[in-house]
Amino acid sequence: YTTNAINKLNLDCIIVGSDEVWNYKEGKGNAAVKFGEGLNCPKLVAYAPSVGKSSVSDDLPEYIVKGLQRFQAISSRDDLTEQFVNSIVNKTPVRVLDPTFLTKFPMQEKSGIKKPYIMFYYCDGMSTELKQTIVKQAHEKGYAVYGAGEGDKLYEDITINLTPFEWIGMFRNAAFVFTGTFHGVVFSILNHRQFQVYMTNESRIK
């Protein structure tokens, strides 16, 4: 939706969130509108946003400072976002659960997977040497190796074109998960999987 399209809906309240919707450095989509820029809605609420790697020490765009001051209610999922918001509006956001913890998700089996497997999900904090060792040992123990949403020539298959429910199914059926992301941790926990974290950056897990 464009800002004009949203305004034409004449909404009474807009809820912004969650995930890294306030990571304005990410560069995906229209970052300004996620801070309320150009929205005519009388009530703006933020649920469990994250600023990702953004910092209050950055040279912040004006739309962020003005935008946050327009929100009637702000919550957050992590420490860095709390600090970020507090430094701008002088209020500490309410700490809330990421919405992925609030509901049960259906799953769908990914076709073509015939044997037990371990899975990598954006594990950028792991060295190439360690990954090669893990893959070698997995093969020796009879496990396939998959990457959910990422590519690496070490994997048997690169399951990039997954539906959301197939993606969940990849976690649910994995023997072990290696991840470097917040939601990689979340879905490993929700599906009671053994997992190991190699942090891409610390704020994404905190």
Q: Whereabouts are the PLM-identified features?
A:
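Aromatic- and Gly/Pro-rich donor/ligand-binding loops
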Residues: 1-66, 112
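Conserved donor-binding/catalytic core segment of Leloir-type glycosyltransferases
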Residues: 112-125
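A short beta-strand/loop micro-motif in the catalytic core of glycosyltransferases
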Residues: 71-78, 178
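Donor nucleotide-activated moiety binding/catalytic core segment of transferases
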Residues: 93-101, 105, 149-185
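A donor-sugar binding/catalytic signature common to diverse glycosyltransferases
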Residues: 170-206
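Structural motif
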Residues: 12-13, 73, 175-176
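A conserved, positively charged/aromatic
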Residues: 65-70, 171
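Catalytic donor nucleotide-activated moiety binding site of glycosyltransferases and closely related
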Residues: 45-53, 84-85, 122-124, 128-164
